[in-house]
């Protein structure tokens, strides 16, 4: 409600009745314990959610019956940089480092390990599935929707990862290597039996979806399902389709494909901004997506994958009239001649007289893309006559790997040059002084 320390998670039944599902404000007396993520078992009967105490990266994973909200006692501690992936209703995979001794800030983070926790057993008996032999900072595992395979990703940085798999249908199966280097980003999107759909930036800086069979995983056997384009690809799956989310100049557009790579449709979004979602199980007939921009509060829509039609499902009640404001995207020139996008938002009728108080925001690091999103704090700023500008600096992920690399290491100065040039543009165009 804007006054609480933590956001509250609700659920809604088919009749539209809402109830609180998880309220992180009740996790601690001082409100500093937050919800760090949650994952449901395949049938939705169980949920594992992570909590972070006092902002720590070390988390606890708590298991709860979804229907009754009864905690069942399988609390896992000392978990860090981890998701949770269920295998049937029997247990789940998670990742962590060795338990820290003394100060948690000094704990080593070069031996990330993947474990399997079987429900109703002690954590100390959890099986080590992968890791511990070679220094790896980030290890994660995900169970395929058909629950036949466990796919394992291992990395030493935020770019590039190894890839492995384990056949869960065979009790004595060994982990098999698919990719043994960190040269590219490789993420399993889905599988149809032994046919794998992989998202990769191998020979495709903006990413593509390729297919191959587990019996012939070598790169020379990869075939394009969704080829690389000039825009960065971020795909999802649901209802038996692949939804290719692209970012063009930091804003979203979505294409729907079948599993043969045939275009079904370009999805009509509510406007220019940021869309996310379109994910779900293959059996689902209705999918959901969110949409927001700098003047539109995040709204959830339903989507019919057969017709392409969408409708508002949940719209927040915010005392803010979006129609009174506008966002304008410009492209300014940085020190070395590179064109950099920036979105400037302000109240309609604002005079460009160089006297407007202005917030200029940028990031330019870690492959993070700054896409349009609504903020109450920014809304208050706009209501009071302020200008809000977001520059998409190099070092981010707005234009893929090349854009990211252009703001790292020996090229880090480009990030600062881009930010300075953004400020100079705002002054030159009389937004501020």
What do these predicted regions represent?
Residues 1-270, 276-286, 292-298, 302-307, ...:
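Beta-propeller folds
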Residues 147, 276-433:
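Serine-hydrolase catalytic core recognition
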């Amino acid at each position: 409600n804007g006054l609480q320390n933590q956001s509250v998670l609700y659920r809604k039944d088919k009749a539209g009745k809402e109830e609180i599902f998880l309220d992180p404000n009740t996790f601690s007396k001082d409100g500093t314990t937050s919800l760090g993520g949650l994952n449901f078992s395949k049938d939705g009967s169980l949920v594992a959610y992570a909590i972070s105490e006092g902002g720590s990266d070390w988390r606890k994973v708590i298991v709860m019956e979804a229907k009754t909200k009864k905690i069942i006692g399988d609390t896992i501690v000392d978990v860090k940089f981890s998701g949770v992936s269920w295998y049937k209703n029997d247990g789940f995979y998670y990742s962590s480092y060795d338990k820290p001794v003394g100060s948690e800030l000094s704990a080593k983070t070069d031996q990330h390990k993947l474990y399997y926790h079987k429900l109703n057993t002690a954590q100390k008996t959890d099986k080590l599935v992968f890791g511990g032999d070679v220094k790896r900072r980030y290890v994660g595992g995900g169970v395929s929707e058909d629950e036949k395979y466990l796919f394992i990703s291992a990395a030493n940085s935020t770019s590039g990862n190894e890839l492995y798999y384990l056949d869960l249908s065979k009790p004595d199966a060994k982990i098999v290597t698919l990719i043994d280097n960190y040269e590219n980003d490789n993420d399993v999107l889905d599988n149809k039996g032994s046919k794998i759909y992989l998202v990769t930036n191998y020979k495709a800086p903006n990413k593509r979806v390729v297919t191959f069979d587990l019996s012939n995983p070598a790169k020379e056997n990869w075939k394009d399902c969704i080829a690389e384009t000039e825009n960065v690809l971020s795909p999802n799956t649901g209802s038996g389709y692949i939804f290719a989310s692209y970012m063009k100049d930091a804003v979203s557009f979505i294409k729907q494909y079948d599993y043969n790579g045939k275009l079904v449709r370009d999805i009509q979004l509510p406007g220019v901004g940021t869309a996310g979602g379109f994910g779900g199980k293959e059996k689902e007939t209705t999918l959901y997506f969110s949409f927001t921009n700098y003047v539109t509060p995040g709204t959830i829509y339903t989507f019919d994958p057969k017709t392409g039609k969408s409708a508002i499902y949940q719209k927040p009640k915010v005392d803010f009239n979006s129609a009174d404001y506008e966002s304008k995207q410009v492209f300014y020139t940085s020190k070395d001649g590179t064109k950099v996008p920036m979105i400037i938002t302000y109240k309609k009728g604002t005079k460009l007289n160089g006297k407007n108080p202005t917030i200029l925001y940028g990031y330019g690091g870690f492959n993070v893309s700054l896409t349009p999103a609504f903020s109450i704090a920014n809304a208050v700023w706009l209501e009071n006559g302020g200008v809000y500008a977001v520059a998409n600096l190099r070092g981010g992920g707005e234009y893929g790997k090349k854009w990211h690399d252009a703001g790292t290491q020996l090229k880090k100065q480009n990030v600062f040059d881009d930010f300075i040039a953004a400020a100079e543009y705002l002054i030159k165009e009389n937004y501020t002084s």
